[in-house]
Amino acid sequence: GTSSNANALGISAGTGIPPKKIGKIYGIIKAYTSRVGEGKFPTELFNNVGEKIREQGHEYGTVTGRPRRVGWIDLFNIKYTIMINGIDKIIVTLLDALEGINPIKMCTSYELDGKILESWPIHYEIIENCKPIYKSFEGWEAIPREQWTQIAQEGYGALPETMKTYVQTIKDELKTDYFALSIGPDRKETILMNSGEVW
């Protein structure tokens, strides 16, 4: 769980597998951001959009049932995470949880005192004074669950065009290739972006 060491080095610590025996590192991110507990969260949503994402993404504590904090995807934060973990490819999950939301936003950088930051702040406390810089995207309509399953079976080309634009922009901003996209909770609702790789 996220209470353990969730970075790439935690793989060795948690499994006993030597670092040199680890092959590729895949980073798993949600199509939005969620967080448990206190802490700085520049893209947090406090409105009905946040509530809709929370409901559609089932963002409630597994044990406590408490609502998790949710917000727009924070690519500025994710870029830093990719760098420090040496991530090779990414997997984006819960794209279906953004259905029926328009517009959809993504944070690409932070602004501090009128200046756009080029890299992640050295001091964590600085984030509290940062303002997220957003790109806005046209959303996609709500789709019945069985249709999401059919889309996954047909592959990437069957995704709504607006979702493909959102997904492509994430890739371009992060400068990282995809391993897979998830548009539902079932394994068969996962789209592998390179069928030659083992899932």
Positions of predicted regions on the chain:
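Non-transmembrane, aqueous-exposed alpha-helical and coiled segments at domain scale
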Residues: 1-199
